[in-house]
Swiss-Prot record:
The keyword Transmembrane helix does not apply. It comes from Schizosaccharomyces pombe (strain 972 / ATCC 24843). Its EC number is 2.1.1.-, 2.1.1.203. This is Multisite-specific tRNA:(cytosine-C(5))-methyltransferase trm4a. Keywords: Cytoplasm, Methyltransferase, Nucleus, Phosphoprotein, RNA-binding, S-adenosyl-L-methionine, Transferase, tRNA processing, tRNA-binding.
């Protein structure tokens, strides 16, 4: 029997109805019956697996690998928060200390064997909760289920790679891909912050694609582009090159496909009531299409990771083997048993039972009733064991919840060593032909078969999306299109002059705005050359949602300062906090104002300051009257100060005739205080 828990907590079911998760019995007879038929694990393991699925999921997070102070955040968490947790208790018991995930690189991920609800509600853990919230907002940590961290790690992304995340929302894996793209090899520099590679993150659902923006913006990357398409029909990305137009092929692709999610019982409690084999059966063909499309878009020599949060072979090995069988001679499964060596895993299985949604068993497609043909394609059934062995199906990874206290997950790492040929078609396509033959007269069916055999899945004839906009306009009707600023634009000229930007480091053609005129009226974004190439060659074929990094923002003067500013031709654009760190690497030293921690505290504690707010011996007071009207970038070297986190801080500063202020949100101020003073920070505790 599944355990019952009782409280007033409520959540939504798939239908959007409120349900009390704690009143749901952790049991589903059909789920148990189906997986006993599969015999994926031994009976003893199945008992452990079933029990683990009824238990609460631990809280896990990882430290952002691309920040230069990542090891400091790790050590800071251990030093300051372990003692707080060690002395904390819930109503029932002592709270266990966090543990570092043994398989995650450099000890940068942690597991707390308590639920997020306990952390949120326990007064003893208030400091921990605020650390998790503030550091997540700052982009220094990412709260993510541990097994979800595995697929991006196995992609081995490097800074020059062209990366595609086919089904990206909610974005935790996309964030990992970006971290890898930006990860410094030695020290942070302009090539680390603005590398040559790109991450294109796609989601088919418009709302989820926009939710993805919030997750990704925390990382302040100019190298990410979010698009909104059905992953199985992703359009080709065109590029211009010296030798003419060409298609963008990706070095790394993540296909974390839609699935039944039956590895997520521990966090999705409503699934105990809702689980049905019908979901997996309905998704199988879509999963094959997405994987096949991913391989078409993959560069020769590139790596693709296919993953699901399902335990079901018909969503996992059946999908992978169908595509491998169709692409023999071009794609292979990679043996990653030596990668992440402390991650406990099982091999892919070579035998499974195929049932209909009522759990009636069908040994082969030939035994299937005619009325189930459309719902159950031949690819559901396992290939002969010899063929599966030739495909190295054992190289797939199965991660079971009872192995290391996680959710359930499946991962397959594929490598494309030759381009796909025109004859490579999946059995799903063949099944469609078969179905039509059952419905059409013989002559008509013969013609249709000939037509289908002429269709292609080859790299040379990838699926095209034809522009349909009127007069060459954007057929997606973007409200805020990506338009690059003309290099002779007056506002851009003023920005370059104001901040002493060296065009040898940052070219003028890297800046764009989000309006149809291409005129910088509000925000200015920055990107790399590849990003621009993608944007300008795909306006009518790709639906762009978000991308680049907001680097400059227009800041209008008040009435008292406006006249002086206009008379002096003062630049009205200032550095945006999102891009302050990147800007510090290409603006002139004269545009940086170096100050002390004591001065910084005064600026953080006030909405606005005057010269009289600083003591007589203050460095800021001495230099105050020499500061230019408008924007300056404030710099504090915390490595030389009494600060918990020793890092370089760059903050936009705005000065008018009467006052001066730092342009940070309240949460940004609180996070900075927390990093300087630790959990005892007064601003952290009192939420000013």
């Amino acid at each position: 029997m599944g355990r019952k828990h009782y409280s007033s907590k409520k959540n939504r079911s798939k239908k959007g109805e409120f349900v009390n998760w704690d009143l749901i019995e952790r049991k589903n007879e059909n789920f148990e019956k189906y997986y006993r038929l599969q015999k994926l694990v031994t009976e003893d393991d199945f008992i452990l697996l079933k029990q683990k699925l009824t238990e609460q999921l631990p809280t896990t997070f990882r430290i952002t690998a691309s920040i230069p102070h990542a090891t400091q955040v790790r050590d800071y968490f251990i030093e300051h928060y372990y003692p707080l947790i060690e002395n904390a208790r819930t109503e029932d018991a002592k709270i266990p200390l966090p543990v570092s995930l043994p398989w995650y690189p450099d000890g940068m991920a942690f597991m707390l064997d308590i639920s997020k609800e306990v952390i949120r509600k326990s007064p003893h853990l208030k400091a921990l909760q605020e650390f998790l919230v503030l550091e997540t907002e700052a982009g220094d940590i990412n709260r993510q289920e541990s097994v979800s961290m595995v697929p991006p790690l196995l992609l081995n992304v490097e800074s020059h790679h062209k990366v595609l995340d086919m089904c990206a929302a909610p974005g935790s894996k996309t964030a990992q891909l970006l971290e890898a793209l930006h990860k410094p090899t030695k020290k942070e520099d302009i090539t680390t912050l603005l590398p040559s590679g790109i991450v294109i993150a796609n989601d088919s659902d418009n709302k989820r694609a926009h939710m993805l923006v919030h997750q990704i913006k925390r990382l302040n990357s100019p190298n990410v582009l979010i698009v909104n398409h059905d992953a199985s029909f992703l359009p080709n990305f065109h590029l211009s090159s010296p030798d003419g137009k060409k298609f963008l092929k990706f070095d790394r692709i993540l296909a974390d496909v839609p699935c039944s999610g039956d590895g997520t019982f521990r966090k999705n409690i409503a699934l105990w009531n809702e689980w049905s084999l019908k979901t997996a059966l309905g998704l199988h063909a879509t999963q094959i299409k997405i994987l096949m499309r991913g391989l078409q878009l993959l560069e020769k020599g590139g790596r693709l990771v296919y993953s699901t949060c399902s335990l079901n072979p018909i969503e996992n090995e059946a999908v992978v083997s169908a595509v491998l069988n169709a692409t023999r001679g071009s794609v292979r499964l990679v043996d990653v048993s030596s990668e992440l060596p402390q991650l406990k895993r099982s091999q892919g299985v070579d035998n499974w039972v195929v049932c209909d949604s009522d759990l009636n068993i069908y040994p082969s497609f030939d035994t299937l009733p005619k009325e189930l043909y459309e719902k159950m394609p031949p690819t559901l059934w396992p290939l002969p064991k010899k063929e599966l062995a030739e495909l190295n199906i054992q190289n797939c990874l199965r991660i079971y919840p009872h192995f290391q206290n996680t959710g359930g997950f499946f991962v397959a790492v594929l490598e494309k060593y030759e381009n796909l040929t025109s004859s490579m078609k999946t059995a799903v396509d063949d099944n469609k032909v078969f179905l039509r033959e059952q419905k059409l007269p013989s002559e008509q069916a013969s013609k249709k078969r000939k037509q289908d055999t002429q269709e292609t899945s080859s790299d040379s004839k990838l699926a095209e999306v034809k522009p349909k906009g009127k007069n060459g306009g954007n057929r997606f009707h973007e409200l805020d299109p990506f338009v690059y600023i003309k290099e002779d634009d007056q506002a851009l000229e003023k920005i370059y002059k104001k901040f002493g930007i060296d065009e040898a480091i940052i070219k003028k053609n890297q800046f764009f705005v989000r309006n149809v005129n291409g005129v910088p009226t509000k925000a200015i974004y920055i990107s790399n050359d590849l990003f621009r190439n993608v944007i300008e060659n795909n306006r009518n074929r790709v639906k762009f949602v978000h991308g680049g990094l907001k680097i400059f923002v227009r800041q209008d003067f008040g009435s008292l300062s406006r006249e002086i500013a206009e008379k002096n031709g003062t630049c009205v654009f200032r550095v945006q906090s999102d891009g302050a760190n990147l800007a510090s690497h290409f603006i002139a030293e004269s545009c940086l104002f170096h100050t002390t921690l004591s001065d910084l505290f005064i600026l953080l504690d006030h909405e606005a300051v005057t010269i009289d707010d600083f003591p007589e011996d203050s460095l800021f007071r001495k230099e105050y009257n020499h500061l230019d009207l408008g924007s300056t970038l404030l710099h504090v070297d915390l490595a030389k100060e009494e600060s918990v986190i020793k890092k370089q801080v760059y903050i936009p500063l705005w000065k008018s005739v009467r006052i001066c202020n730092v342009l940070l949100s309240n949460s940004e101020k609180r996070t900075l205080k927390l990093q300087i003073e630790g959990p005892q920070s007064s601003i952290h505790k009192h939420n000013t």
